[in-house]
Amino acid sequence: MQPEERRRWLQQVLQVALASPHRGWSLLLDVPGLPGANVELSRPAEGLRLVVGQGWRNEARRPVHQSAVGWLTQNGFEGGGRKGNYRTWKVPMDLAQLAELMDEAIAHGFAPPQGYDAQLRTSVPELIDQSKAAWRDYQSRKEDVPIKSWH
């Protein structure tokens, strides 16, 4: 999947996620084959937060590339301490800007293979169903979406 295609798809998923009435959800964009290479958008009680290199449940964290630290800092991310992740509460509400920020954070932080197919994971079942519909609408095909959930 090329960056423009991935960002358009991500915008559709973000539109559904941000419109959700639920609080306390997470939406994780990750790179298949690179465990721990991810960006998590979450909506805790304090507002929206982005975390680069969050890790996921029992998966090991993947430290971001040292060359990415300047880019992350320039884009409002802080961290890199004991856990090695970077986070920001300065989350753009424009869908195109948010999709680009998430995609660029993965590109700078983890250098995934060019044209990688992103995967999403979420903690809100309604988002999974709605995201599948957004993916199908975008792709105009009837394949499953690589979205994972847990209970």
Set out the residue ranges of the language-model regions.
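Structured alpha/beta or helical-core interaction and ligand-binding surfaces enriched in interleaved
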Residues: 1-151
